[in-house]
């Protein structure tokens, strides 16, 4: 049974049993704690946690997953892979243990004719959690599994949790006995190579507390509702159903290995080392295609680094196998042709995937050539000196100059019997990051060379900041730069950077935006200040434009800030402190500040959190903040020693470095933080705070965006107007709106389903007419045509196969149908066995048609799919297919 059929059969089986089929989510995880989706349940986490209402009580999916922790083991074992498809069925408070177990048993053991996978029940072994008497009783008494094929295991093997406090529960695994050639008897507790796990049923019924590892945590109690989360590895089931030794020999990976052997001349099975490389190539190329297809591009951080690492390992292993030229395009085309049957978007997005992959291949081949020479020289020098450790600076050079990921250097060094000074490498990497941050901060002033600012600091001393007490004041120009170059004077229209001996202007820092305003000279000259930065400690650089007159160093000036803007920013900054404290009160000290920006009338606050903050918690936080405003608490600032500040429990601000004396901002009895920013005098001055929402900005970091003061009021006023309009439209009170709108959307969805059903029936009804239209081309029945626009790929495929099946007499048959979906042409072509014996293969025909359509395609000899960009060329594509059939038949 092909992988595509396993996938189709899974979804069909559970849909027939009341489950709503949900498409695979993107591999890019919508979860700050994850770079990529590693399990089928990840897209459903909000439902299990009660944060979002599930789309249905029963759901099924086949989820794309990527896991890379064991990447070094890929190819060396027959079970490790970076990409896999997780088939899952989920229940949110609906059926529980007995229902999940019954469904799993039926799916695996029902005959193929009855929609199951037809596994031999005698080869299935069950594991249950040590104390789960209920699950064992169901397996034994309800299903009929003999007691000797049911084994109890501990928390490590048969108890599931997310690794943090939250839902958890015992699980039951279904294992398949592959026979004595894979090891000794004794069940999965003894030999997991012979008794391979294929399906895990998780019974989420408890809430766990904090703890370490898979076993050391307490059970706090029962969950309000009991849920089911199951996962079956599609590749593992394919291995069994296709009767192969390991997952690399299944249909979707073997074709990639076959292409790699074709490109290198190496035979699979000849020797272990080349087999490992072939398996690495097959796995990594497939993973690369799936990642690029979901929008990941190679890079040096996060998901991009995962992709780059995987692609470069694949390319290098092709080199180890003897490949000399570019190989990536040939390999990814095989993956797209194969996986495109299950994920048609890969076929339509082929060009972009190829472009991204080929660019990375070109970059790495260039890097590999130069970097390998450097590495070989370094290895030779190290060995000649009697060393066994490659220096960290060599690894850094390879990374910085040639783009070698550290794990590639580790791997290549190990092949030469050397280890690598990883600590030294990481130290140099950190030094580079620190330098980059310093340069970025300097460039923010418009001039990366800090010498001019240091010279001003050396001659004139630090700028005295007077902005805490006053919004304007007299000063003197002690430094002047025009277009980044020191100058004694500047004239009207010049872009300038001005340094004063004292200033009321706040320089950007601590998350607070800089003040803006004007600097006036006695001569009438005016500088409009647009930004203020501190490129070196103690020096305020005022960036702006000379609007009128001439400005000279040494001239007396009067500096004044935009007071309205300053007050709006101060409100935002004080609101940020209140939000920080309210979040810590709600979530605990882990909700530490990770960044902020305070601008006029609005602010954003970044904080640590392993998961999204529930909407109810955000509502409570907002209410708490506004309660504090109504208490009219005084806001006070005091300078004290850092030790005294710590004793008082003051919270340090993210990203700031502090000296021995620090400024502490205290808001009544509610908040106390180290802060150099400007604030209101009393919380009543904030007026109102409105949290707009919360989102992820990275792994383990969330962001709240909010409005304060008049901006918050204006937002609520607009919302009130919208609510009033909705009331008028649906004829209901505000509290009735969600239910009424949900009902309307439900009716709309039902109507769309009916339309879709009618359209599908109409398409299939055309089958008889299409059969009658068949042409005889040199003894081959050829059916071509264009079906109504908007026909889905699945419906088009069903129609093509239906028409092919109706052609009688055992004569050769080719069916090629076309449609337009979302403005793009789509074709599915099928051939029967008699046609294939004449050399008429669906994949060849599709490639011919798709080329005419301005795209690409592929598939199996019996059925293939393609698409393009030019729907006007469908007639030409039909003609091209007819010509090829005529020439071949």
UniProtKB/Swiss-Prot annotation:
Cofactor(s), names only, from the UniProt record: Zn(2+)
UniProt-listed Enzyme Commission number(s): 6.1.1.7
Classification via InterPro entries: aa-tRNA-synth_II/BPL/LPL (IPR045864), Ala-tRNA-lgiase_IIc (IPR002318), Ala-tRNA-ligase_IIc_anticod-bd (IPR018162), Ala-tRNA-synth_IIc_core (IPR018165), Ala-tRNA-synth_IIc_N (IPR018164), Ala-tRNA_ligase (IPR050058), Ala_tRNA_ligase_euk/bac (IPR023033), DHHA1_dom (IPR003156)
PROSITE patterns from the UniProt entry: AA_TRNA_LIGASE_II_ALA
Cofactor annotation remark: Binds 1 zinc ion per subunit.
Binding site for Zn(2+): 573, 577, 675, 679
A cellular component term, taken from the record's GO annotations: cytosol
The keyword Heme is annotated on this UniProt entry: no
Main location: cytoplasm
Transmembrane segment boundaries: none
Subcellular location: Cytoplasm
Domain of life: Bacteria
UniProt key word Hydrolase: no
An annotated GO BP: alanyl-tRNA aminoacylation
GO molecular function, one term: alanine-tRNA ligase activity
Family: Belongs to the class-II aminoacyl-tRNA synthetase family.
Function, in words: Catalyzes the attachment of alanine to tRNA(Ala) in a two-step reaction: alanine is first activated by ATP to form Ala-AMP and then transferred to the acceptor end of tRNA(Ala). Also edits incorrectly charged Ser-tRNA(Ala) and Gly-tRNA(Ala) via its editing domain.
UniProt name for this protein: Alanine--tRNA ligase
Annotated source species: Streptomyces griseus subsp. griseus (strain JCM 4626 / CBS 651.72 / NBRC 13350 / KCC S-0626 / ISP 5235)
Gene: alaS
